Amino acid sequence: VKSTSSPRGSKAAERRTSMFFMTHESQYDNMNAFFRTNGYDEIYSQENYPKEKVVNHFGVADDFLFSYALPVLRKHAESGRPFFATLLTISNHPPYIIPERFNDPKLTPEEQIVKYADDCIGQFIKKAKKEAWGKNTIFVFVGDHGKLVGKADCELPESFNHVPLIFHGNGIQPDIRHQFTGQIDIAPTILGMLRIPYTQNNLGLDLLSDTPRPATFYTADKTIAARDANTLYVFNAETGKEYVYALPQIKAAKPSEASRKLKRYAFSLLQTTEYMVQNGMTTNKPHNNAR
């Protein structure tokens, strides 16, 4: 399978069904069109839910989203076809709607909503593990972005870009990997764990078998950052200004060979990706032997 995204990769390999569950309206951020273009068969959104379950402009709460998804996933599992499902939660995003049972005067609103979101995930996993399909399913948890904690430590705060990535399921041995990674690595890692053949047509890595990255880079609007274990390089494409920091203290430093190496690393990956997209090299086309 030629794959740049898990929905297309898994679907082409074994005729799987791909689903996306979101709390809000499907047109938000053009998600409906984007996800369907990228291989999702079914989209579940605010349009599918009872109006009385909508709690704010971000739609329904996390616990309802998980409860809604469970019977849908069960139905697909009972059909005998494997599925790939993504659930996008939103409760940990202001404005916070905190259920009464999680109101705790000793905690800040941010802490209360995190406790609620964590409980929703925990309850979902407990219920999913009781399902027949839950015993042979890989669960992946990742944040789309972090949250600014305290004062900004640099132009692209570490706390806003350092997010959890957890793979969970039967047969997965407990382990903590201290290595650089990015969301682009999730699809290759899942396909590797499932032993689904694929042609790599993006710059992601299989975190369990490929050589670890020497560094990582990330962007926000017109700002680019790259870092390794000792140095952080930041570039503002709008102003042309460069910033260098020594790690782990994130202390301002002078440009060095290490920062120049990080700059080349980030720019080469960005330019390569742009070239691949512009020349149709990331298009998914199943191999002739795909079922």
Language model features with spans:
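Solvent-exposed soluble domains appended to multi-pass membrane proteins
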Residues: 1-291
